[in-house]
């Protein structure tokens, strides 16, 4: 008998050579085998999971969640169920379920034009303004507020890429400033015309090293100011968020100083905080405290997450895996 584990489910053709003790071939045997996916035990031992409730949170504490891709998930056949096994198959019921379980804010990314010349979406939820409006309508029905995250690009932006939207290619800094102010203002009036859902707006996403193709601090701050004006002209009560990618290397300190120097009108300095990349909790606390005490601005974690398993479920290497980012820095 011999055991062999196939790489994936399917039909395999097997050729085996039979040899004598001296290594002489006696014959060859051909056959086929069909490999099936293994049955995976998805049961969770809840007795081993204890999450202590944080007491005395302020009434305005943000319990946020990003559901930017949920509409494309539903369209692709993804099924969510409530605790009673009832299927949730639309974004409105999904938001109501979240509200019933303590979520009070939804974060939604917006890309300028996430489609190619043939109208094919780039993926990632194809998060255009129309998609954000659908999610805003669902939030309104559920009584949830919304943070709109304008990447000011046609697809994902992060510290490594801050691509200029197709329609703005070749623009000067002044032209970009006029364009981003107009785009944000018009988009918000489409997403939430009644002005009762959106209460925070990110002008850019993880903009530590650049924004709309600009890497010079003065130019970036000019664009931040233009985007902020677009927000405040829409609704002066909406809070403007400037978002950097990490609290490490004094990033919040540096950028709060930069924003002060160039007199950018904003309300909150946000940061991403992924424990396996972004340092200790004590450093995060120190960076936030600096923004609050030095510049009298609010600060927040705008993005965070951690892996719920180290298992490989799809054949693609996990970001967090055994021996690589599999423990948090200071959690």
What positions do the PLM features span?
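C-terminal edge beta-strand
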Residues: 29-35
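Extracellular recognition modules
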Residues: 13-17
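N-terminal substrate-binding region of glycoside hydrolase catalytic domains
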Residues: 40-134, 138-144, 153-179, 270-273
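Residue-level recognition of secondary-structure-to-loop junctions
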Residues: 4-8
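Active-site cleft segment of glycoside hydrolase catalytic domains centered on the general acid/base Glu
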Residues: 121-122, 126-131, 157-259, 264-266, ...
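Hydrophobic faces of well-ordered beta-strands that scaffold small-molecule active sites
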Residues: 61-67, 106-108, 146-150, 199-203, ...
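Short, solvent-exposed loop/turn segments at the edges of extracellular beta-sandwich modules
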Residues: 19-24
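Substrate-binding and catalytic surfaces of secreted/luminal carbohydrate-active proteins
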Residues: 233, 239-240, 266-331
């Amino acid at each position: 008998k011999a055991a062999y584990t196939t790489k994936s489910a399917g039909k395999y053709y097997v050729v085996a050579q039979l040899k004598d003790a001296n290594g002489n071939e006696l014959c060859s045997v051909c056959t086929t085998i069909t490999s099936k996916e293994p049955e995976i035990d998805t049961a969770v031992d809840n007795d081993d999971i204890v999450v202590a409730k944080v007491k005395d949170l302020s009434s305005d504490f943000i319990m946020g969640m990003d559901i930017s891709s949920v509409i494309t998930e539903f369209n692709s056949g993804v099924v969510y169920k409530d605790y009673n096994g009832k299927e949730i198959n639309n974004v409105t019921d999904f938001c109501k379920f979240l509200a019933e379980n303590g979520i009070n804010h939804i974060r939604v990314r917006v890309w300028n034009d996430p489609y190619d010349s043939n109208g094919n979406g780039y993926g990632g939820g194809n998060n255009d303004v129309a998609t954000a409006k659908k999610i805003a309508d669902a939030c309104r029905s559920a009584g949830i507020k919304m943070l709109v995250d304008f990447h000011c690009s046609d697809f994902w932006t992060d510290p490594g890429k801050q691509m200029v939207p197709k329609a703005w290619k070749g623009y000067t800094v002044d032209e970009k400033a006029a364009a981003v102010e107009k785009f944000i203002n018009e988009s918000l009036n489409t997403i939430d015309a009644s002005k009762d859902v959106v209460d925070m707006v990110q002008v850019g996403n993880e903009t530590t090293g650049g924004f709309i193709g600009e890497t010079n601090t003065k130019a970036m701050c000019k664009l931040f100011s233009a985007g902020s004006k677009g927000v405040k002209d829409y609704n002066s009560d909406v809070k403007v968020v400037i978002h950097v990618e990490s609290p490490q290397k004094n990033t919040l300190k540096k950028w709060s100083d930069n924003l002060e120097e160039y007199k950018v009108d904003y309300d909150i300095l946000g940061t991403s905080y992924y424990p396996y990349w972004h340092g200790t909790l004590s450093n995060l606390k120190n960076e936030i405290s600096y923004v609050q005490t030095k510049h009298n601005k609010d600060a927040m974690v705008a993005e965070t997450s951690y892996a719920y398993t180290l298992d490989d479920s799809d054949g693609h290497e996990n970001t967090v895996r055994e021996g690589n980012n599999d423990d948090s820095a200071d959690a």
